[in-house]
Amino acid sequence: MQHNKKTKFVMYVDDFLDEATLKSLQDTVTNLEYQEVKNPNGQLYGMRHTFDKGINNDPLIKLIKQYFFPHRNLEPISVSAHLRENNKEPLFHTDDDKGNVANFLLFVKGEPLLNNGTGFLHNEKLSSHIGFIENRALFFNGSKISHSDLQSFGDSSKRYTLNIFYKEND
């Protein structure tokens, strides 16, 4: 059966990495240098560290493929660590630039709070809210589904995530 490219999907897996790999990734992301990221309106999304293309050969990239898209030919466009502490307003958006067709989001480090998680819109209304739990991996087509952190909705704290955007190779 062929993949329907119009399908909207959000899926997640808890306890995605083994403990040693998660700890190593937590140590890495908390010691990176981050740069501000703003949307086209000048609003601050948060802080980002973009990894170089060499990370595409990391075993983590292969693990993501095994779990989420073993039968699709997706290739990372960008791999970055994000630090968010957004207590002002949700900044819903789609990630449809550079040919992006899918997003991977790993909740790396932060408090296990519902509002530290990510929300998804359907018909411009919040329809799904996936709370933050360390080592929770999300995979969704962020070019089709508007999404945002929901830290401004209530109790939240800073959160570190690993974000990967994918393009599809035919």
Segment roles from a protein language model:
Residues 1-84, 89:
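Non-heme Fe(II)/2-oxoglutarate
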Residues 76-170:
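Catalytic core of non-heme Fe(II) oxygenases with the double-stranded beta-helix
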